[in-house]
Amino acid sequence: MAGEDHQWQGSILYNMLMSAKQRHAAPEAPEARLGDQCWGCSCGDEPGVGREGLLGGRNVALLYRCCFCGKDHPRQGSILYSMLTSAKQTYAAPKAPEARLGPCWGCSCGSDPGVGREGLPGGRPVALLYRCCFCGEDHPRQGSILYSLLTSAKQTHVAPAAPEARPGGAWWDRSYFAQRPGGKEGLPGRRAMALLYRCCFCGEDQPQQGSTLYSMPTSTNQTPAAPEERPGAPWWDTSCGALRPVALKNPQVVCEAASAGLLKTLRFVKYLPCFQVLPLDQQLVLVRNCWAPLLMLELAQDHLQFETVEVSEPSMLQKILTTRRRETGGTEPLPVPTLQPHLAPPAEARKVPSASQVQAIKCFLSKCWSLNISTKEYAYLKGTVLFNPDVPGLQCVKYIQGLQWGTQQILSEHIRMTHRGHHDRFIELNSALFLLRFINANVIAELFFRPIIGTVSMDDMMLEMLCTKL
């Protein structure tokens, strides 16, 4: 039999049977090869090792025939084994990515470190990785762009920390009376909630209390808070709320006193020797431009006091009905007037003075009364106002300029002789003249003369008074 076995050792059947028996036997471990690396698999990287832990301490090496080199290699070094083990790694928990020095331009992974989700059983952190669409690398969810968008959208419903106080910015990025950036108090647990809004000017997030839209009324049912007490605004400031229309409380008495003051003013101007030498057209130019401040000085000298009452302007319907009646020739009845019908012109032709404009007149009168100006000082001040070389349309500018300079010199000499502190007195008188710049001539005409002269122009009345003997 031994010879027969030796005879069949080289046959194909013998080789198949012997290879089948090797599965149940414990073959010896393959010897380590010195070189001869296999290029078709990874057997050259890892040495062939056996499976330990069987009964008797025998090692079993599962060999596979390499499809490239034709040699037997252990299972750990085959290509199929490497593919299967690498595929299983996708289901395992990956390690947290190491911190990179260079920031990723496609997401915010460079800003926030890669952290995992805490709070799972056992306290094990789990990092959910997402493939970045820009850099092609895996980043934790906290560092992705989508996560940043979602978390920023959720901040409007949660209570974020109050923003830090920033240095005062430019005036256009917030309202003037902006409150301090803070949260909404009164929530359960005394938690502060700051509602942030993106500023359309500076592009930064600012609290709602500091924005310009917050200052506007947000609801019709909202009760306005008591305004803070601010320093008193000057009478020429139009933001103080004194734009309501007013009228004289006693128009007949005040208008007669104002007309008498205008008559005395024109008589004083007309009979000045230096004024009489001027041509009539030059006289008319000076009077038309200086009658209002001259009248204010005369009313201050006469100590004219008056009171005003607030009136309501005619409605749009009343203006339409009045205009329609004038066009149709008076066939329709007149609407109910708000002022004296025999003194006031039509509603669309009137410009009712406002409270701030009347307050400017009273301020000038009070200033003059506080200085106790004498009769001569009033006369010199009137001469200074009358001979104004800056009046447009004036031809004899040098002559008028010389008259004004001479009047100032006479006033200064008079003050030096009658007052010790003549420099201060001269400055105070000129400061009173400076207040005349804030008084409009049309306001004086509407307030004191419109109820009497009606639609007659003040320029025509000045011409008539200059040509007639007063």
From Swiss-Prot:
A motif (AF-2 motif) lies at residues 461-466. It is found in: Nucleus; Cytoplasm. The keyword Transcription applies. Residues 205-469 form the NR LBD domain. InterPro entries: NHR-like_dom_sf, NR0B1/2, Nucl_hrmn_rcpt_lig-bd, Nuclear_hrmn_rcpt, Nuclear_receptor_repeat. This is Nuclear receptor subfamily 0 group B member 1. GO terms for molecular function: DNA hairpin binding; nuclear receptor binding; protein domain specific binding; protein homodimerization activity; RNA binding; transcription corepressor activity. A motif (LXXLL motif 2) lies at residues 80-84. Nuclear receptor that lacks a DNA-binding domain and acts as a corepressor that inhibits the transcriptional activity of other nuclear receptors through heterodimeric interactions. Component of a cascade required for the development of the hypothalamic-pituitary-adrenal-gonadal axis. May also have a role in the development of the embryo and in the maintenance of embryonic stem cell pluripotency. Homodimerization involved an interaction between amino and carboxy termini involving LXXLL motifs and steroid binding domain (AF-2 motif). Heterodimerizes with NR5A1 and NROB2 through its N-terminal LXXLL motifs. Sequence repeats lie at residues 1-67, 68-133, 134-200, 201-253. Homodimer. Interacts with NR5A1, NR5A2, NR0B2 and with COPS2. Interacts with ESRRB; represses ESRRB activity at the GATA6 promoter. GO terms for cellular component: cytoplasm; membrane; nucleoplasm; nucleus; ribosome. Pfam families: Hormone_recep (PF00104), NR_Repeat (PF14046). It comes from Callithrix jacchus. Belongs to the nuclear hormone receptor family. NR0 subfamily. A motif (LXXLL motif 3) lies at residues 146-150. GO terms for biological process: adrenal gland development; gonad development; male gonad development; negative regulation of DNA-templated transcription; negative regulation of intracellular steroid hormone receptor signaling pathway; negative regulation of steroid biosynthetic process; negative regulation of transcription by RNA polymerase II; protein localization. Keywords: Cytoplasm, Nucleus, Receptor, Repeat, Repressor, Transcription, Transcription regulation. A motif (LXXLL motif 1) lies at residues 13-17. Residues 1-253 are annotated as: 4 X 67 AA tandem repeats.
